[in-house]
């Protein structure tokens, strides 16, 4: 699935303008069937205005302090199994290639559980998903619900039969 992304910027004389109007393809990962990532915008530092609205470099999935990421991810149902012929090393290499830095945050002994040095703002667009925290609590979220995560250890679990779409904004933060 593609998502349309309209980006504004400034002309040389300071007027607002549409800098780009494009479609962003989903990033899919073989080891995460039913899951999609749309990396819509991001930067590794705070922007300065006026600017032309051009895309900034933001290669890593998680932003550094002062950086940000904006996107949509689709959490596939937990019932959709990984392919039986999956080569784990090849799959991890694909994950690192398509979403740099995310694999190092995932816990091998607890699939999906991860921690990042970010404050995460999430809004559930459609479907339902469970936010699992490391104290054992699970919070069911449905379309219209929001989450603010403050660098917490968590996982997303989709116990339903339908995909769940979530809009997110990650902002890099300090951890003591």
For every predicted segment, state its role.
Residues 56, 76, 130, 138, ...:
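Ligand-binding loop in jelly-roll beta-barrel domains
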Residues 27-77:
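Short, well-structured hydrophobic secondary-structure segments
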Residues 23-24, 56, 70-116, 150-153, ...:
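Conserved short histidine dyad/triad with adjacent acidic residue
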Residues 108-142:
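A short beta-strand-loop-beta hairpin characteristic of the jelly-roll/cupin
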Residues 6, 10-11, 15-20, 25-27, ...:
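Double-stranded beta-helix
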Residues 2-4, 116-117:
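Short, small/polar residue-rich loop motifs at catalytic or cofactor-binding pockets
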């Amino acid at each position: 699935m593609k998502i349309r992304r309209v980006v504004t910027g400034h002309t040389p004389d300071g007027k607002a303008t549409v800098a780009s109007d494009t479609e962003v393809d989903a990033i899919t990962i073989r080891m995460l069937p039913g899951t999609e990532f749309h990396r819509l915008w991001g930067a590794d530092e705070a922007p300065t205005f006026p600017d032309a609205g051009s895309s900034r470099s933001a290669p890593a999935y998680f932003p550094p302090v002062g950086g940000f990421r904006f996107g949509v991810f689709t959490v596939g149902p937990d019932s959709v199994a990984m392919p039986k012929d999956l080569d784990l090393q090849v799959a991890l290499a694909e994950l690192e290639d398509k979403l740099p830095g995310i694999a190092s945050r995932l816990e091998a002994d607890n699939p999906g559980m991860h921690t990042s040095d970010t404050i995460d703002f999430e809004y559930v667009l459609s479907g339902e998903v469970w936010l699992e925290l490391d104290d054992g609590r699970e919070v069911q979220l449905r379309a219209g619900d929001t989450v603010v995560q403050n660098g917490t250890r968590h996982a997303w679990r989709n116990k339903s039969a339908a995909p769940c779409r979530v809009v997110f904004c990650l902002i890099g933060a300090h951890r003591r």
